[in-house]
Regions:
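C-terminal partner/receptor-binding element of secreted or periplasmic proteins
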Residues: 169-200
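Acidic, glycine-rich flexible loop segments
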Residues: 128-162
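Hydrophobic membrane-insertion alpha-helices, especially the h-region
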Residues: 6-22
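A mature extracytoplasmic/lumenal domain signature
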Residues: 75, 117-119, 126-130, 158-162, ...
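Short extracytoplasmic/periplasmic juxtamembrane "stem" segments immediately C-terminal to an N-terminal membrane anchor
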Residues: 34-48
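Mid-length scaffold segments of soluble, non-membrane domains
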Residues: 79-140
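Extracytoplasmic/periplasmic/luminal assembly and interaction segments
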Residues: 54-93
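Ser/Thr/Pro/Gly-rich low-complexity linker/stalk segments immediately outside membranes or between
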Residues: 24-38
């Protein structure tokens, strides 16, 4: 990754390591989540162009692991070569391949969320009712390994939700979750607000 961009480069290193634990079925649920978070911490802090200010960093804040936010749902693939114009925090747009739509039931509410194809993984950016209160105001994202999608089924673990780099450093340009991915309930899972950066 290089400064002022979000969709490129070294971020794949973090994805690869953390997703190893996120999809491991051999570890107990809580241990798997805790290991994944620790690997995320170690990798983002060791990045050559880390968005974290190492002089002031203390720790990341997370909700406690909650298996009720590990959700299996329906997946509808998009048409071949279909793209979506994703708005960025600097008012620019980024054309990104649209992988499809995930239909999930969360706390009794059915939501249909757009899922994007980043090459190595799928990307699910979202907003929810915790924004600017318990979590970063600009929304969060989940990276989903492609093997978590099986034909018309998808597994989404909101415990793996992380802040966009803009939550750590205003010098980064990040995607804004599309309006279709606004979830009308609180997702008390994944990463919480970082420091005082509640708004994008």
């Amino acid at each position: 990754m290089f400064k002022n961009k979000w969709f490129v480069g070294g971020f794949i290193v973090i994805i690869t390591v953390t997703l190893y634990y996120s999809l491991s079925t051999e570890l107990p649920f809580v241990e798997r989540i805790e290991r994944s978070r620790e690997d995320y911490r170690q990798n983002i802090l060791s990045m050559e162009d880390s968005p974290i200010d190492l002089d002031t960093f203390e720790h990341f804040e997370y909700f406690d692991p909650n298996e009720s936010f590990l959700i299996e749902g329906k997946f509808t693939a998009s048409k071949e070569n279909e793209t979506f114009k994703l708005m960025m925090t600097d008012s620019s747009t980024n054309d990104i391949p649209l992988a499809g739509t995930a239909e999930l039931v969360i706390d009794g509410q059915t939501v249909k969320l757009k899922v994007f194809d980043e090459g190595e993984t799928f990307l699910l950016p979202f907003n929810d009712k915790t924004n600017s209160i318990k979590t970063y105001g600009g929304g969060r994202y989940i990276n989903i390994e492609k093997r978590a999608v099986n034909d018309d089924e998808i597994t989404v673990d909101f415990n793996e939700a992380h802040n966009f780099y803009c939550a750590y450093n205003i010098n980064y340009v990040c995607p804004l979750p599309p309006s279709e991915n606004n979830i009308g309930i609180e997702i008390d899972a994944g990463e919480r607000t970082y420091g005082d950066h509640q708004h994008d």
